[in-house]
Amino acid sequence: MQVHRTKLLAASGGTLLFGILFGWVLFPQILKFMISKQVTLKPGTDVRELWSATPFPLHFYIYVFNVTNPDEVANGGKPRVQEVGPFVFDEWKDKYDLEDDVVEDTVSYNMRNTFFFNEKASSPLTGEEVITLPHPLLQSIGISVQRERAAMMELIAKALAIILPDAKPFLTAKFMDLFFRGINVDCSSEEFASKALCTVFYTGDVKQAKQVNQTHFLLSFLGQSNHTDAGRFTVCRGVKNNKKLGMVVKFADEPELDMWLGDECNRFVGTDSTVFAPGLKREDGLWAFTPDLCRSLGAVYKHKSSYHGMPSLRYTLDMGDIRMDEKLHCFCDDPEDLETCPLKGTMNLNRCVGGPLIASMPHFYNGDPKLVQDVDGLNPNQKQHEVFIDFEPISGTPFQAAKRMQFNMDMEPVEGIEPLRHQRKVIMPMFWVEEGVQLNKTYTNMVKHTLFLGLKFNAGLRWMLITFSLIGLMSAGYLFFKESDSLDVTMPPKIIKESNKVANQPTFAKQQQHQDQQSQSQATAAPNVPIPGVDLSNVKVELRERF
């Protein structure tokens, strides 16, 4: 029994140790190793195929702020806006001209976004709705010249009057014309002022303009972004170092930007937002470089979440407060003067796009309260206007995300241009967009069957081993306790031998022994001596054993 108790104790202890080591140490390392070998941008892998051409469209929503009192605002009144939308588009993402560098473990490519209007999802909106917005060309040129080239104001004012006859501070046009088809810009005039201004169109400095013939251009917010090159990236493939998967190394063949007033703001941090490395820690955040903003933005962990029954982590981001973060002072017009920094929740895009544009969260969510107070019709709230991503960190899979951004005109009075002379200084919201994705069951099942079933198997196995080992340990302990509580009496071998010898003596020996005992009794009996007055004839003497 003692041998069995020891074996049971050893087996149970070994099972307990194996369950702990395998469940919490070995299995996670094995899983991490397997994922690191599969999740790379090496040619031929599933991840490379999905990354290079997204097999499903993203949802792209556009919400427009229709100005309902344009004449009043032009005369210095408070703007009043009405949100119109969403206009829904299917956005397809693909990468082309891919070039791998095995030595550097990088891949270079051109990014392309293609938009298709989704009539069904946009209904009842058709895209032909008439919208009133700040005039994108008149406002941006007039304000930029006043701030940076005031000496040229007279020439520019004359050119604008020729190119944009009868232009007003606010432009009223159909949604599709404003955003995709374009509004006409006439550069056919032979006037010197007109030719001087139109030079920026012919050289391509106005990125939102598309040349249709020798003298005319079409200007739109997103027309030039549709099915065109969005920039050339160079990113890490993650073969040699999986932690660097997707990290941007170069953009436009440059290792960093050169437009901001500090290295911290010019650095590339994170990926191109279409892929993330597996095994990221919560405190690392999710960083991505955004060419539209000419900067990198990082989402921070907020809380645990779930998607289709699978656990995930929710990350959120906003524009922050540049004034309060010393590392971001390079985004100010003058890093030494905090008064030149943008308001909380905004970012000045003038250096990025060459115009008085301000980026923010939709409806100025999480921004300076003054931004909302200056415009009627805004209603910021977390559910509709927060940027978030539900992320599975082990595999690096984003389950669902909503990337939202609002674009605003940084308006101010322009003395040199009559239509803009009396307007008030205000950050005027124009439109906001949402790029959303939700993985369907086809792709969530891939994660579920390859990752979470393995995790569940590991959890079940380790707890089963621990349970059985604890039962075994308790059983062994009970057996030890039971045996130690009982008393085993063992006679010495010599006594046992003598006892057996006496027990085996023949009958005559026992009779002889009995006779000897009788003789001894008689010898020890009291002598028969007469005592006067005492009759001892009838006295019986009993022999008693002495103990």
UniProtKB/Swiss-Prot annotation:
Cysteine-cysteine disulfides: C265-C330, C294-C352, C332-C341
Biased composition (Low complexity): 511-522
Entry GO MF terms: scavenger receptor activity
Main location: membrane
Keyword annotations: Cell membrane, Disulfide bond, Glycoprotein, Membrane, Olfaction, Receptor, Sensory transduction, Transmembrane, Transmembrane helix
Membrane-spanning ranges: 8-28, 461-481
Superkingdom in the source lineage: Eukaryota
Residues on Extracellular side: 29-460
Pfam families: CD36
An annotated GO BP: sensory perception of smell
GO CC terms, sorted: cytoplasm; plasma membrane
Cytoplasmic topological intervals: 1-7, 482-547
Location in or out of the cell: Cell membrane
Residues carrying a glycan: N66, N213, N226, N440
Disordered, as annotated region: 506-531
Membrane topology classification: Multi-pass membrane protein
Family listed: Belongs to the CD36 family.
Biological function: Plays an olfactory role that is not restricted to pheromone sensitivity.
Protein name: Sensory neuron membrane protein 1
